[in-house]
């Protein structure tokens, strides 16, 4: 992208901070795309991904700030709480889909509205980072190195999970033909959850 811009006499990355931001935001988009593509490949488009990410991040920020007041360890606690909250919210979304047997598009729209309503209630419609921002909460993402490490870890985990595990085998079978996969004994419901 920088090369294309340079051919037109423009720069995107003009200093180290610009490079840091480029890698960090590339990591965010890449990881979100990987998460979204998991459902897309199997025919279940999920609109609730953004609301799920926002609600789990706000939950992590609020809890870590309430417990540690933004002090030492707040970023690590926020990360742990955010991951757990994201997993729980994803499980709830999957349970709604499996239990109610509503088409995935309707389920994801409903879950999006519910999660955004909860998010609005928790934050009172205000930007949460003005409340919790301090050096311990934002210092983690200050350099491209952490983003590059996260990209590498996500790629390795994704490759191992989807290419070398029983879950990946079932996922790929369901992705390539749900009816045939189910008829051969692969259980769709645990895979969807």
Which stretches of residues belong to each language-model region?
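Structural signal for alpha-helical transmembrane segments and their membrane-water exit/capping regions
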Residues: 1-12, 42, 119-123, 158-166
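Single transmembrane alpha-helix segments in multi-pass membrane proteins
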Residues: 2-6, 15-68, 95-101
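Interfacial loop-to-helix junctions that mark the boundaries of transmembrane helices
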Residues: 12-24, 71-80, 136-148
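Residue-level recognition of pore/gate-forming positions within transmembrane alpha-helices
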Residues: 29, 54-58, 86, 112-113, ...
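Small-residue-rich segments of transmembrane alpha-helices in multi-pass membrane proteins
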Residues: 55-61, 110-119, 183
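Helix-loop-helix "hairpin" substructures at the membrane interface of multi-pass membrane proteins
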Residues: 74-82, 88-93, 143-193
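Transmembrane helix-bundle core of multi-pass membrane transporters
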Residues: 100, 104-165, 190-193
